[in-house]
Amino acid sequence: MVYIEKEACVNCGTCMRLCPMGVFTRGETGIEIHPHRRCIQCMHCAGACPRKAIRFEELPEEAVYPQLPGEPLEELIQSRRSIRHFSDRLPEKTAVQHALDVAAYAPSGKNQRAFRYTIVWGKNKVEELRDRCMALCREYGEAPELPKLLAKGTDLLTCGAPCMIVVHSPDDCLNPVLDPAIGLAQLELLLVHQGLGTCWGGYLRQVSDRFPEIRSYLGVPEGSHVRCALMVGYAKGEKYLNPVWRPKADALWLEE
């Protein structure tokens, strides 16, 4: 269970702003734990806390705030965080295209490389996509939380990102879901290495599955579906200062 070390906390509100589950709230004496919200141990709070004041009852402090390994690739993987607050600043188009070209080396079943990308580029185009999705959600009751939260100022579909990278593939290819996920995961690390923020867009996949109008808007041909999507841009006020804990891999070794 998550709790706050009061002596270390400076009540800056960073944990409250970045927690995707709304676990933190401001009380009479400072930041408190909301009694009815569930912590998913994503550890955004611990990663961003400037005073390392976040604690977890089942973990010692040195486990919550581990040291980075020092090896660049390992550090890149361990320091990657989901960004949900983006500035309006566009990434460099040539840099994104370069990352796409490098990610083309990702493995795929029988080297089919059957998936394709649609890049929704610029704040206005992303908002146009968002508004089309929201209109359909309101009309047909799909993901009803999305338009309700948007009306309160929270955009879970695009998080205000100025760019969205959408991956689609034919239904009849060898690995219609796995190959796009592998490709996008490698692309994400390349973008993070460039200093960009990213967040996987599960809601866009859900809405596009439901509405062919969205697939058409995204240039997805008949017989194909969106498999995954990535919000891309520069973080707005999100700085993750600390590496955080993850459980060790759950692995079964079959040995001689």
Model segments located where?
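Acidic, surface-exposed loops and disordered segments
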Residues: 1-256
